[in-house]
Amino acid sequence: MGVTKKPDLNDPVLRAKLAKGMGHNYYGEPAWPNDLLYIFPVVILGTIACNVGLAVLEPSMIGEPADPFATPLEILPEWYFFPVFQILRTVPNKLLGVLLMVSVPTGLLTVPFLENVNKFQNPFRRPVATTVFLIGTAVALWLGIGATLPIDKSLTLGLF
């Protein structure tokens, strides 16, 4: 750890610079009014113009009309619900499935209390949290991929 030199506030040159506003609290130009009144509205209006331009030039197609009498064979949720859908689909008891879904965020909330870490550290110095993260990621990917397959191949991912 290096030795830091504290500024001498009795130095007349330093006092003159601080009096002119050249101290630690003066960095570049102020945000008001330059950024907030001139730059931000241009960026916001430019973003809105790009979105409107893309919507006008390349509109998304509406698709086929809905038919309430023709239901697809299997209804799948959005991709980020695939692991939860797979848990509910494979567990025979509904209460157990709901408890398993509740246990995931509960388990994630307990991870910081498992290790005695007061500040951010290298992941290699936090083996429990790193292991929980890696296993959780692998299980979420496994469940997510399995949710897209038929029920008889979902647990083995069709490999066995």
Curated annotation (Swiss-Prot):
Where does the record place a coiled coil? none
What keywords sit in the KW lines? Chloroplast, Electron transport, Membrane, Photosynthesis, Plastid, Thylakoid, Transmembrane, Transmembrane helix, Transport
Q: Can you say where in the cell this protein is located?
A: Plastid, Chloroplast thylakoid membrane
Q: Which residues cross the membrane?
A: 36-56, 95-115, 131-151
Cite the Pfam families for this sequence.
Cytochrom_B_C (PF00032)
Q: Which GO terms describe its biological process?
A: photosynthetic electron transport chain
Q: Give the molecular function GO annotations.
A: electron transporter, transferring electrons within cytochrome b6/f complex of photosystem II activity; electron transporter, transferring electrons within the cyclic electron transport pathway of photosynthesis activity; oxidoreductase activity
Which topology term describes how it sits in the membrane?
A: Multi-pass membrane protein
The record's GO CC annotations read: chloroplast thylakoid membrane
For this UniProt entry, what is the primary localization, expressed as one broad class? Answer: plastid
Annotated family: Belongs to the cytochrome b family. PetD subfamily.
Q: Which PANTHER family match?
A: CYTOCHROME B
- Kindly give the NCBIfam families that the UniProt entry links to this protein: cytb6_f_IV
Misc: A longer mRNA that is not produced by splicing has been shown to be transcribed in barley and maize. It is not known if this mRNA is translated.
Give the record's subunit note.
The 4 large subunits of the cytochrome b6-f complex are cytochrome b6, subunit IV (17 kDa polypeptide, petD), cytochrome f and the Rieske protein, while the 4 small subunits are petG, petL, petM and petN. The complex functions as a dimer.
Role: Component of the cytochrome b6-f complex, which mediates electron transfer between photosystem II (PSII) and photosystem I (PSI), cyclic electron flow around PSI, and state transitions.
The name on file for this protein is Cytochrome b6-f complex subunit 4
User: In which organism is this protein found?
Assistant: Zea mays
